[in-house]
Amino acid sequence: MSSGGLLLLLGLLTLWAELTPISGQDRPKFCHLPVDSGICRAHIPRFYYNPASNQCQGFIYGGCEGNANNFETRDQCRHTCGASGKEGPRPRIASN
């Protein structure tokens, strides 16, 4: 196979690996933690993985405490927890 063909194959394999969702067994345990806005009163839009819908959904983070199921962007959440690309509901305030 030519070097151009090998390069194309490598590129396609890399793309496939990036786009293949993580299976539930490979997903970090913290992806299954419930949404937790924390105890502080800031108003910071964040995203959490919702295992019931297999989506990353918005919520309002208070700025302290909470848990590790808390991402600055939807893309970070999807990449870490392997969520589907469907858009979840708008951010909501989670009650403790």
Swiss-Prot record:
Domain BPTI/Kunitz inhibitor residue range list: 31-81
GO MF annotation list: serine-type endopeptidase inhibitor activity
GO cellular component, one term: extracellular space
Chain positions found as Pyrrolidone carboxylic acid: 25
Domain of life, source organism: Eukaryota
Cysteine pairings via disulfide bonds: 31-81, 40-64, 56-77
InterPro entries: Kunitz_BPTI (IPR002223), Kunitz_BPTI_sf (IPR036880), Prtase_inh_Kunz-CS (IPR020901), TFPI/VKTCI-like (IPR050098)
Sites marked Reactive bond for trypsin: 41-42
Entry coiled-coil feature ranges: none
Localization in the cell: Secreted
Family: Belongs to the venom Kunitz-type family.
The protein's role, per its UniProt record: Serine protease inhibitor.
Annotated protein name in UniProt: Kunitz-type serine protease inhibitor 5
